[in-house]
A protein has these predicted regions:
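Solvent-exposed alpha-helical segments and adjacent loops
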Residues: 1-169
């Protein structure tokens, strides 16, 4: 039947086939919280929020802010872990740490230098592990970066693999 409106008429004999493809991970920040939470990983079971093994209170606070921010995107079950980096044996690792506590192998993945003030947030892939690294010299910058990632409208504007976050933004 013809209908002047922009509607599709579905009858009892209509057959619909709907397909979707899983996008490749582009390592861009606007995709956050993907791949930490996705259709293939709805409860975060393949992801971990990790702090340095020598974590202090500021690192733990920022990590908890990230966990809370992702809570709305998780399915009813939350299987994502909060752990020390040495225990983060997951495919996707969201790392929060002060530069002085960050292992050299993670610092070597960064393509930009960690600023003296503020934080560097960068998506990188190392082998089979996808990382979101949040590294700062100042404690307050870690919470500021976590607040940025908890704001979906700000994250949607980050069409790059890294950004700098200033304290007080």
């Amino acid at each position: 039947d013809y209908n002047g409106a922009n509607w599709v008429k579905i009858a009892d004999t209509t057959c619909l086939r709907i397909y979707y493809e899983i996008s490749d991970d582009a390592d861009e920040l606007y995709m956050y919280p993907y791949p930490f939470i996705s259709l293939m990983n709805p409860n975060g079971a393949e992801s971990a929020v990790a702090v340095s093994d020598a974590a202090d209170e500021a690192e733990l606070t920022a990590a908890m802010m990230l966990m809370a921010g992702m809570g709305n995107s998780l399915s009813a079950e939350n299987a994502m872990t909060l752990c020390r980096l040495s225990d983060a044996n997951r495919q996707n690792v969201l790392y929060v740490g002060l530069k002085k506590n960050t292992p050299e192998h993670l610092l070597s993945l960064l393509t930009q230098s960690v600023p003296a003030t503020g934080a560097l947030v960068q998506r990188v892939t190392d082998g089979d592990t996808s990382y979101l690294l949040i590294v700062a010299e100042e404690e307050a910058a870690l919470s500021e970066a976590a607040a940025l990632l908890s704001d979906t409208s700000r994250v949607a504007q980050l069409h790059t693999s890294q950004t700098y976050v200033s304290v007080g933004e």
